[in-house]
Amino acid sequence: IQTIGRAARSADVVLIDTAGRLHNKQNLMNELNKISRVVDRELPGCDRETLLVLDATTGQNGLIQAKQFKEAAGITGIVLTKLDGSAKGGIVIAIAQELQVPVKFIGVGEGIDDLMPFEAEKFVEALV
């Protein structure tokens, strides 16, 4: 919360990593919602990107998770990780379609160069 206040005074970019939030842990989701409200209050009108990072091995539970994260924080995009293994991440199609939230990036490894822009055609080819 203090980071957001400081950013309002002197930063061009703020990254807030809320790793470990589980949609079934209400206190953590409430905290996420609070962070979102503070950003709205302290940085009104800012260009804001709120990304939900989803593991490609996530099944149908991913849709429930995405719905609750969208409600709590207004997600604007999805990052689909762990596509370097046998996981295909097909649930992301249902999430993107139902919630009207685009997939922005994919992760295919653990290095910084392994985060790549999402390319729908390549993703669909890999699914079939």
Model-inferred region functions:
Residues 1-128:
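P-loop/Walker A NTP-binding module and the surrounding RecA-like catalytic core of P-loop NTPases
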